[in-house]
């Protein structure tokens, strides 16, 4: 054998060893690629108050179901996914995995064959340094789920930092949902949505070859920020408050700003004690973050550019009936489809049963736009109203037997507001008078 041939075989052998090492490394670290999924736009819907009624039919709804009974007051959707929330703290055990699957099986059985349930999503904010443990837990869930049931997880953006064990989790799931909201290490009083940098995130997510849907914020929040003597800020969230609780108060001064993601933030500085509001003290700031057409459209446009294994958008969330901080799905759909969202208020009427009289409960849908000035809304009845019982935060007035007047203050929020009950001797239709 010549010196040249010896060198050739040494090079071949070395290349073979290197190739084997690369293949071994790939097999140990990479999750197997999953089939791509069709694009769908969906919503998370959270347990609690009944969901807002709307004629909009979603492609897919991710339903938080804390018990073992399937909620039967859900909006119509082509498909549903069961969501189980795991709070941070307790160790994830095999018993926890078994309990999740047992609850999922009970829910699918209770829902019946007429409800199309695609699978289970686990909503768990796993610490990044525990992703390997989370992967072992997901393996237990995956192997216990019935055949054909898909497994999805929510995902924190921090998981995708360099040198994490995120593959340990992704290898066992059919889908992950990176959440582009509340992405910081701690929640702040103002701002929710995270600007979506497609050039940064698309290559990262697509490299795992696992389908994903992008989680986008369509909700708002009210928070109080209080600074102590050392300059440290403490944030408290007001979960049952409405923007209408703060408008028109002399004890508050108002300013506004926009977040980097395009949300509107209405700031109220407390300048004097407020009667009946012991939780607010002079020096406090109340920050109201509201989603806007700009914030939702920018996020949706970005999500459509991901390509690869991107399989859609999930909006957090479908609002309840009494919310004034969250965009209605109808309005979200208009925004993401490129249409101009409506600017006018809309009236909704329900007819409860009353003895010997016609009763009509009136709700004013404020629309998706945030107005920076007060506006007047006139409601006209096609016949005489014998009695109008005003209720709710807007304090409407019956000016004439067939007309009701409502003043909607600036920055009143989103969603539907109850106006009161109209009582008449016979059927009466109500409509908003064009301005």
List each model region and its residues.
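N-terminal Sec-pathway targeting helices
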Residues: 1-16
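Substrate-binding surface in catalytic domains of secreted glycosidases
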Residues: 139-247
């Amino acid at each position: 054998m010549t010196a040249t041939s010896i060198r050739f075989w040494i090079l071949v052998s070395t290349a073979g060893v290197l190739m084997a090492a690369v293949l071994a490394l790939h097999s140990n670290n990479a999750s197997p690629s999953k089939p791509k999924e069709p694009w769908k736009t969906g919503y998370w819907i959270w347990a609690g108050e009944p969901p807002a009624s709307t004629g909009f039919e979603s492609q897919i709804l991710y339903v938080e179901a804390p018990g073992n009974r399937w909620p039967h007051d859900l909006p119509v959707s082509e498909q549903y996914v069961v969501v189980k929330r795991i709070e941070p703290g307790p160790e994830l055990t095999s018993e926890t995995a078994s309990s999740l699957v047992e609850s999922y099986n009970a829910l699918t059985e209770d829902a019946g064959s007429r409800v199309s349930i695609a699978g289970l999503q686990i909503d768990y904010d796993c610490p990044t340094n525990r992703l390997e443990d989370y992967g072992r837990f997901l393996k237990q869930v995956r192997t216990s789920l019935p055949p054909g049931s898909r497994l999805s997880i929510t995902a924190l953006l921090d998981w995708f930092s360099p040198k994490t064990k995120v593959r340990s989790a992704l290898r066992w799931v059919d889908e992950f949902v990176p959440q582009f909201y509340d992405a910081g290490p701690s929640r702040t009083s103002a701002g929710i949505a995270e600007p979506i940098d497609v050039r940064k995130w698309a290559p990262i997510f697509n490299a795992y070859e696992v389908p994903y849907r992008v989680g986008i914020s369509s909700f708002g929040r009210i928070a109080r920020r209080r600074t102590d003597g050392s300059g440290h800020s403490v944030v408290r969230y007001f979960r049952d408050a409405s923007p209408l609780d703060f408008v028109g108060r002399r004890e508050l001064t108002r300013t506004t700003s926009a977040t980097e993601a395009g949300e509107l933030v209405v700031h109220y500085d407390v300048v004097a004690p407020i009667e009946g509001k012991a939780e607010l003290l002079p020096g406090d700031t109340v920050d109201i973050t509201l989603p806007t057409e700009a914030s939702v459209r920018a996020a949706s446009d970005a999500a459509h550019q991901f390509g690869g294994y991107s399989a859609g958008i999930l909006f957090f969330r479908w609002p309840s009936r009494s919310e004034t901080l969250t965009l209605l799905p109808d309005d979200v759909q208009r925004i993401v489809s490129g249409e101009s969202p409506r600017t006018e208020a809309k009236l909704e009427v329900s007819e409860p049963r009353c003895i010997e009289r016609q009763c009509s409960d009136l709700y004013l849908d404020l629309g998706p736009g945030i107005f920076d000035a007060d506006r007047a809304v006139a409601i006209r009845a096609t016949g005489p109203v014998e009695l109008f019982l005003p209720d709710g935060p807007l304090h409407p007035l019956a000016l004439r037997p067939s007309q009701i007047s409502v003043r909607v203050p600036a920055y009143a929020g989103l969603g539907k507001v109850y106006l009161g009950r109209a009582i008449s001797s016979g059927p009466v239709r109500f409509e908003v008078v064009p301005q």
